[in-house]
Amino acid sequence: MAWLAGERWKLKAFADFDAGHGVDLYKATYARTFQVDPADVTKKQRQIGKVMELGLGYQGGVGAFVNFARVYGIDLEGEFLHAVRNTADPSDLRAGEEAFEWQSAQPDYVADLSPDAWAACYAVRTAWRRAHPAITEFWAALGRAVTAALSPTHRAGMMHRAGDHVLVTAYPHGDDLRDVLIRLPSGRSMLYPGARPAYASERALMIFEDCEYSATPTRTYSGKLCENVTQAVARDILVGTMQSIEDRGYKIVLSVHDELITECPDAPEYSHGELSRLMATAPEWAKGLPLAAAGFEAMRYRKD
């Protein structure tokens, strides 16, 4: 996602860590978000940084952050609240308090956090977005491109750019709907069939009215499209390495998320180091994308 959006400080953080002279990403994220020295980031603050990375990257808000925080055992009413109050911008906390007043007045609001903890989560969300201007702009660029593709002025074949690597177009689908295609940097496209612009009351970017995979209309938004694009690009990179891996004599027997499990002769010319190098080879269309891989050798599949 950082590469797609052009978030240069984060790309440098990845590259520095891979080169062995940088802090890990969760510390770097916490430090950048709250403008503190990475060396001063505590173990508990690093855990907050991890939840920020996992929960906020695809336009997640307070709800997404809370869900991930609970998965990773963060006490939002205790140590988290103390850590945020000590490092967050006071104006972000005040904005969080004001946002809570509005949110808590909504008929569908469920009170599962204290006002102070909710405001602290909102402050984290605000600070993370401010620390990632290129990523937040990429969300907006995807939204603008899709909106343009669904607009009355769009004509079949017109391309709308979202950042430096992604193009969006659309083709008619019946009388009122369109098939939206998002072209990835690899040249492959993702299809969103039977789409229309969302109404303001639907709180979405576009709606799929005619989709064989769902009996009811499905809504999506810019952050979710960012997730779709990011995961699709990751897939293209992984699949793109498979042929060279097979050609080198590593028989691929299974893939699990971002892992490849291979079988090969128990001989010195085969190693997990070489396999990692092959997996971390960027394709021609992904110049400037930092890649790293690690692995191990075993007689059966297991987690490292």
Regions found by a protein language model. Name each.
Residues M1-D304:
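Conserved catalytic core of nucleotide polymerization and phosphodiester-bond processing enzymes
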